[in-house]
């Protein structure tokens, strides 16, 4: 996968040199390039200006971003604008992006964008209902969530298939050594070696956590007969 990032602050992306994303780059599975669009600004390197019609704050000018975009070697990229007014990012969207060969992220700053910048864009995306000072942190979050889904980046595909949201439910509790720590012990079922009972326990705990913490996820989740019975028991025990 090739990722190009248009930003005023390329130095903010140093975390992408480490951990899973960094290893993907070392393996040649991922190429990330940064483009400081200030370097393409014609007007005394000014990238922002006052909005026509008046108003608070400054807007990013169209020319520096267009020229930076035009300079990128690309074929048919998905172009993502980080915008608080965009569609909210989620796991399904990360899985969709992981199928792409080329991504371009445009990171904003200041009050907003000249609207004409959006003619370059295929997707306008937000992390949530809050405002950041720029799009860099949002871009890094999206890149991390996407890159880990690329085949061969994480050793076992099941490692991310069991993650919260990948299945539509929150992830079940997990434990490792020691068995007993300060009186807190690992559930006996996980020590039993009985694979079917472990599967059932994990599914039950996953449903329970989702019901308690993110019941909204269940509104769009297609329950199996087994899951319906488990959820009914969970609700009954809560009453």
Swiss-Prot record:
Gene Ontology terms: cellular component: cytosol
Compartmental location: Cytoplasm
Keywords associated with the record: Cytoplasm, Methyltransferase, S-adenosyl-L-methionine, Transferase, tRNA processing
InterPro entries linked to this entry: Alpha/beta_knot_MTases (IPR029028), tRNA_m1G_MeTrfase_C_sf (IPR023148), tRNA_m1G_MeTrfase_TrmD (IPR002649), tRNA_m1G_MTases_N (IPR029026), tRNA_MeTrfase_TRMD/TRM10 (IPR016009)
Domain of life: Bacteria
SUPFAM superfamilies: alpha/beta knot
Residues that hold S-adenosyl-L-methionine according to the record: 108, 127-132
BP terms from Gene Ontology: tRNA N1-guanine methylation
Record's signal peptide: none
Catalytic activity: guanosine(37) in tRNA + S-adenosyl-L-methionine = N(1)-methylguanosine(37) in tRNA + S-adenosyl-L-homocysteine + H(+)
Similarity remark: Belongs to the RNA methyltransferase TrmD family.
Classification via PANTHER family: TRNA (GUANINE-N(1)-)-METHYLTRANSFERASE (PTHR46417:SF1)
Assembly mode: Homodimer.
Entry protein name: tRNA (guanine-N(1)-)-methyltransferase
Organism: Streptococcus pneumoniae serotype 2 (strain D39 / NCTC 7466)
Gene name as annotated: trmD
């Amino acid at each position: 996968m090739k990722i190009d990032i248009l930003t005023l602050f390329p130095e903010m992306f140093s975390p992408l040199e480490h951990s899973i994303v960094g290893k993907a780059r070392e393996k040649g599975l991922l190429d990330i390039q940064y483009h400081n669009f200030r370097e393409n600004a014609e007007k005394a390197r000014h990238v922002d200006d006052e909005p026509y019609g008046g108003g608070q704050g400054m807007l990013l000018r169209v020319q520096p971003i267009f020229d930076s975009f035009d300079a990128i070697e690309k074929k048919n990229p998905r172009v993502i604008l980080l915008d608080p007014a965009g569609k909210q990012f989620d796991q399904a969207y990360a899985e969709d992006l992981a199928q792409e060969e080329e991504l371009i992220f445009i990171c904003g700053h200041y009050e907003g964008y000249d609207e004409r910048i959006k003619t370059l864009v295929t997707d306008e995306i937000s992390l949530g209902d809050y405002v950041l000072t720029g799009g860099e942190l949002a871009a890094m979050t999206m890149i991390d969530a996407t890159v880990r889904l690329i085949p061969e980046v994480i050793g076992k595909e099941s490692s991310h298939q069991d993650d919260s949201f990948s299945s539509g439910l929150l992830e079940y509790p997990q434990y490792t050594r020691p068995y007993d720590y300060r009186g807190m012990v690992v559930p006996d079922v996980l020590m039993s070696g009985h694979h079917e009972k472990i599967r059932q326990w994990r599914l039950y705990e996953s449903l329970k956590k989702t019901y308690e913490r993110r019941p909204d996820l269940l509104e769009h989740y297609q329950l199996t007969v087994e899951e319906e019975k488990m959820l009914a028991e969970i609700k009954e025990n809560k009453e």
